[in-house]
Amino acid sequence: MSKPLRIVFAGTPDFAAQHLAALLSSEHEVIAVYTQPDRPAGRGKKLTASPVKTIALEHNIPVYQPENFKSDEAKQALADLNADIMVVVAYGLLLPQAVLDTPKLGCINVHGSILPRWRGAAPIQRSIWAGDAETGVTIMQMDIGLDTGDMLKIATLPIDASDTSATMYDKLAKLGPVVLVECLADIAAGTAIAIKQDDERANYAKKLSKEEARINWQDDAEHIERCVRAFNPWPMSHFEVAENSIKVWQSRVEASSHDAPAGTILKADKSGIYVATGHGCLVLEQIQIPGKKAMPVQDVLNARAAWFEVGSVLS
């Protein structure tokens, strides 16, 4: 049996917390946790600890929350921990080379896609947005680049036709910890194999924006439907009708032909709101009007039928 690793864990959101929990149940020793400083949250804007900090405190693990690693004090504090390795999962801070070089075995990162396909901040969303058949988790040895380090372990998952970013996030949050613990076992045993990324196959998964999530009805129906799933739970695909912003939670593609201008409502009944697009027809199945929760289209039509009259054009 390999000697347990002394691990410093760096992460912030719930996705990271699930990986920390797996490490705490493994043979390895988590000697310290780094996480983002407490941030105001909720209506009262009360300073709130990250999910990672909450778990660390429950297990009496020392917590460090530097704003950055620019100071000599911050770098020295990490060095004093004498860690074998740092595990980084959705930490939210860029790590300078001096930090990457501090642990004996360097730093590894859990990335929510199959590298090098999607590097950057929004790989889960972009994989759905692009119509990829699968995604997964990559464990990589970190270098100074953006998700450019050598790959140590990859596990894949199919993207189902009904998957949203929310459902894929949950699936990867379950897969990632398993792959991480397996990878650490390889590292501890000295059997991990590092594979260089093919930079020519890399794409940048840029952050999502509310502007991008506004539906362009000139696009083809299949692309819009993928956007609806990719932008759920944020920033949510939306359109305007009667000067109201409507969020789309669920839709489907109808393979019917039409000659109506893009954005025109072709039909509206309990089966959905049928909207002409640049190619094909998009059927809205679940939407959210201002001040209400997401509802089946039938319920919305009972209250707001005038907004969705056949022949009217959505913007």
From Swiss-Prot:
The keyword Protein biosynthesis applies. (6S)-5,6,7,8-tetrahydrofolate binds at S113, I114, L115, P116. PROSITE patterns: GART. One of its GO terms (molecular function) is methionyl-tRNA formyltransferase activity. Keywords: Protein biosynthesis, Transferase. Signal peptide: none annotated. It catalyses: L-methionyl-tRNA(fMet) + (6R)-10-formyltetrahydrofolate = N-formyl-L-methionyl-tRNA(fMet) + (6S)-5,6,7,8-tetrahydrofolate + H(+). Gene3D superfamilies: Formyl transferase, C-terminal domain (3.10.25.10), Formyl transferase, N-terminal domain (3.40.50.170). InterPro entries: Fmt (IPR005794), Formyl_trans_C (IPR005793), Formyl_trans_C_sf (IPR037022), Formyl_transf_N (IPR002376), Formyl_transf_N_sf (IPR036477), Formyl_transferase-like_C_sf (IPR011034), GART_AS (IPR001555), Met-tRNA-FMT_C (IPR044135). SUPFAM superfamilies: FMT C-terminal domain-like, Formyltransferase. It holds the Pfam family Formyl_trans_C. One of its GO terms (cellular component) is cytosol. Belongs to the Fmt family. Attaches a formyl group to the free amino group of methionyl-tRNA(fMet). The formyl group appears to play a dual role in the initiator identity of N-formylmethionyl-tRNA by promoting its recognition by IF2 and preventing the misappropriation of this tRNA by the elongation apparatus. NCBIfam families: fmt (TIGR00460). This is Methionyl-tRNA formyltransferase. It comes from Vibrio vulnificus (strain CMCP6). The gene is fmt.
